[in-house]
């Protein structure tokens, strides 16, 4: 069964359904060039505090692994900004959302206080998947519609 109506338009989503999808794919070389050009200022502009600490730890152990970490976080932020429909404009900014890891290793989005009120008024849960290979990094984000006050989808 198709999700496209006879008129060709996608029907509106019900509360609790998908409200937004974002995807970003980038060449890791792009991040390497930005780091070479701007140094740590680039990472400090993009990463939140917990991400930045993890970036430095990974880069100390293996510089290439640090770059891949930064690339996946960059991609996740781009994908998230697309899923919420803002791009990189207020109240969205690079450091206001972090991709951290749950105890089992699953990536989770942590939305900073500066963005949380805006996000919580409009959306439900957000989900992220990230990956990297030798030359590419990618992230995919799905944002759920905010559930109805009575909890119905």
Swiss-Prot record:
Its cofactor is Mg(2+). This is Holo-[acyl-carrier-protein] synthase. It comes from the Bacteria. It is found in: Cytoplasm. GO terms for biological process: fatty acid biosynthetic process. Transmembrane segments: none annotated. Its EC number is 2.7.8.7. It is an enzyme of class 2 (transferase). Disulfide bonds: none annotated. Mg(2+) binds at residues 24, 78.
């Amino acid at each position: 069964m198709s999700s496209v109506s006879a008129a060709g338009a996608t029907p509106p989503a019900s509360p609790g359904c998908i409200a937004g999808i974002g995807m970003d794919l980038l060449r890791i070389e792009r991040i390497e060039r930005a780091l070479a050009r701007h140094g740590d200022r680039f990472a400090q502009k993009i990463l939140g505090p917990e991400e930045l600490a993890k970036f430095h730890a990974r880069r100390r152990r293996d510089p290439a692994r640090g770059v891949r970490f930064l690339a996946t976080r960059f991609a996740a932020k781009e994908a998230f900004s697309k899923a919420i429909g803002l791009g990189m404009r207020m109240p969205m900014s690079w450091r206001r959302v972090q991709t951290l890891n749950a105890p089992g290793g699953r990536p989770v989005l942590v939305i900073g206080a500066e963005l949380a009120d805006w996000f919580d008024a409009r959306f439900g849960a957000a989900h992220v998947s990230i990956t990297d290979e030798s030359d590419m990094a990618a992230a995919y984000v799905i944002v759920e519609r905010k559930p109805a006050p009575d909890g119905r989808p």
